[in-house]
Amino acid sequence: MSELAFGAGPLSRAAATVHNLLVVEALLVATTLPGLVALLLDRTVSNLPLVALCALPVGPALSAALYALHHRGSDLTELRPAAAFLRGYRLNARGALLVWAFWLGWITVLAVNLANLGAAGLPGWWVAPSLLVGAAATEWMLNALVITSLFAFRFRDVARLAAYLVIRTPGVSLGNCCLVVVVLGGVLASSEAVVALAGSVLVLALLHNSRRLIAVVRKEFTR
């Protein structure tokens, strides 16, 4: 009977996953500290641009977390999640910031317009298309963040691929939609801080849901 090597059993793999998640969570919190300032602001429309500015570091941090968890090891003797996170941050910070800032800009403008619907002279039916645009932009952002975190493409190529894959991989889009609903539900039921503490688990869920997207990009758009 063959014996399992140390660190190769199911308990060891579970322990490795927990270790990876805890380390990545700690690094996520550390690299998004400026964003915590937004939690101290009043929830008023006038503060939305400042909230968006505080949230800018979140994009590169999420990208680094995606990179680290994608390259995570399951062997207890070969766990280096911190090194993978820092490498992902260094490689992808610029691309992730472009994706994140572009999305934040769209969402901030939409949120301000919706909050000032009457003052802006917009009709009530404007809410529905605005929400659809916001949902589509969020689907695009999640795809773009995964692509720019795991592949080396130019921003314009990432933007086009992300939009194309929203339609090409409907299962991924539906899963991402459910993930966004979970996040919004968590924020409404508790607070942004509680959701942030589950950041690494949510990133792992996004990565798991994006397996089909990653496979399509690797097979059809890389050599």
Predicted regions and their residues:
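Helix-coil boundary and N-terminal low-complexity module in membrane systems
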Residues: 1-111, 122-124, 140-142, 147-180, ...
